[in-house]
Amino acid sequence: SSHELNQPGTYRDVSDTTVVAQFSVKNLSEKAESFLNKSYNDFENACKKLLGENVLTFPLDITLPESLEALTDFLNEKNVKLNGFLHAIAMDKTIRQKSVKPMLEVTADEFNDTMTVSAFSLISLSHALLKSKVLQNGASIVTLSYIAAEKVSFFPYINMSIAKAALERLTIEMAYELGRDFGIRANCVRFSPYMGSKAGNATLKIEDVERANRISPLGNANPEDLAHEVVHLFRKDIRITGEIRHVDGGFHIMG
């Protein structure tokens, strides 16, 4: 299955290598640093529990070129070649304790940090993996989003929604560019509101999820539904690319 976290973010690829992607934070308190370390340790333990003790994990600061280089060096040392990866990296400092800043109060730094981590990271990660010959020709890239990238919604996403809109547009551009050059596919999947992830738990309220469940013709999708769609898009030699797919129980068709 896949997991989208607020801090740190993660992506899971199809070769049982899992990377935790963190953004660069300066002047951390001991308490904050301890929290980040515990988050990574918890994630690493969860991966091993679900995927086996031999699963590879690697901490990554997605904002630093030297950290990306360390990742690709690690993968090459392990002789890992990727036939695809799931990008589920996201961060937004304007959401705190289920409260979101109005758009006009978002600072340039907050906007740019969210865009860099949540959208541009797709470019920097793909470039690093291709340059190092880790990502193979004919591979599949999948990104995660939600309906708020397109419409104003009752979910508490404002700044992040803009980053997700950018991520979706980048996915389409990469479908064209990487498809022409390397036969690589790129698709995006929009998922139902979900509180089982750290991001969802930090932002959504129970009533948000319940409301979406009532509105959706099939009710909210669950993580297994999302995982099945991602695995389908990872399949070899299917000519599906540049799509924004919906795994949301039909929520997106409702007015």
Report residues per predicted region.
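Short-chain dehydrogenase/reductase
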Residues: 1-109, 122, 126-127, 171-172, 201, ...
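A glycine/serine/threonine-rich, flexible loop-to-helix segment
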Residues: 46, 158, 181, 188-216, ...
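Residue-level signal for the nucleotide or nucleotide-sugar donor/cofactor binding architecture
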Residues: 63, 120, 220-224
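Generic structural signal for alpha-helix termini and adjacent loop/cap motifs
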Residues: 78, 128, 132, 235-237
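C-terminal substrate-recognition "lid" of short-chain dehydrogenase/reductases
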Residues: 80, 219-247, 252-253
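Hydrophobic structural elements of the Rossmann-like NAD(P)H-binding subdomain
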Residues: 86, 142, 186-189, 242, ...
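Catalytic loop of short-chain dehydrogenase/reductase
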Residues: 90-181, 190-195, 219, 251
